[in-house]
């Protein structure tokens, strides 16, 4: 009996120490993350206040059922998106993986937080509402996107089933993401280059408004400068500008190229790479170029939507593809600026609505 009591006391002491150790860990993470975050935010915002709510780790764990698969939305690189409810309000919750964020990626995590906070006043960026500093890396809390994130073919996936969106909505998404990129390029003294435009970074809210997310690969040019040499080539294969890939030189046209590929995917519903009739992989850019050069854009395959499109709508899809091909010209001098792309897409969208 005495030995059992001794054992129980020992277990209680151990449990108490573990709880204390866990609490100390959370406090250390809070102080470290808070210090870095505050420093970066002050530098970025010139001391201006940006209201961001602070959440506790218990709130985050309860909202996501301790990061359960039932709350899973999407996984991308070194983070996972969850949906969760806190105080009767739905949120998108972004958790960085402490196992996948290597030393050189730590700065990208904080860059994502700071730039997301700065972009929160623009309707086409996913709005950052708060964060929790009680994890190895801050857990971010964003506005809820009811219709989720675009899949690799520019559609949405519901209960495992892919669904392509109506042409009018796909045009709207293209225009809104073009607006978001133009904002990055023009709204600040230092041009911001996004560097990783692709469907998996685009969320849709309850009004089907497109929201660009993940600014971790973004890079700012020096004030008055039009280019910068990056330390590393960051982005997604298939969407990368070949000039940037070869030289590491980043300009606003780096985004224009990636957006061109993005637009082709979203408008046609064809993935960036697909299997050709000969069984070999085909890139969407080469495929579209071939059709355009041979005057066969009318032969574009529209998976699952061909029968639903009018001849007028097909002509508008062709116009979008031709615009996208201009974005992907080899020489940057031959590519339009993002603001020009956004204006052209608005013109095409309005023409479709009248058709």
UniProtKB/Swiss-Prot annotation:
Disulfide bonds: none
Subunit structure comment from the entry: Interacts with RPP13L4/ZAR1.
Organism: Arabidopsis thaliana (Mouse-ear cress)
Protein kinase domain mapped to chain residues: 67-353
Record InterPro entries: Kinase-like_dom_sf, Prot_kinase_dom, WAK-like
An annotated GO BP: defense response to bacterium
Keywords: ATP-binding, Kinase, Nucleotide-binding, Transferase
Protein name: Serine/threonine-protein kinase ZRK3
Function (record text): Required for RPP13L4/ZAR1 recognition of the Pseudomonas syringae type III effector (T3E) HopF2a.
Catalytic activity: L-seryl-[protein] + ATP = O-phospho-L-seryl-[protein] + ADP + H(+); L-threonyl-[protein] + ATP = O-phospho-L-threonyl-[protein] + ADP + H(+)
Recorded GO MF terms: ATP binding; protein serine kinase activity; protein serine/threonine kinase activity
Binding site residues for ATP: 73-81, 94
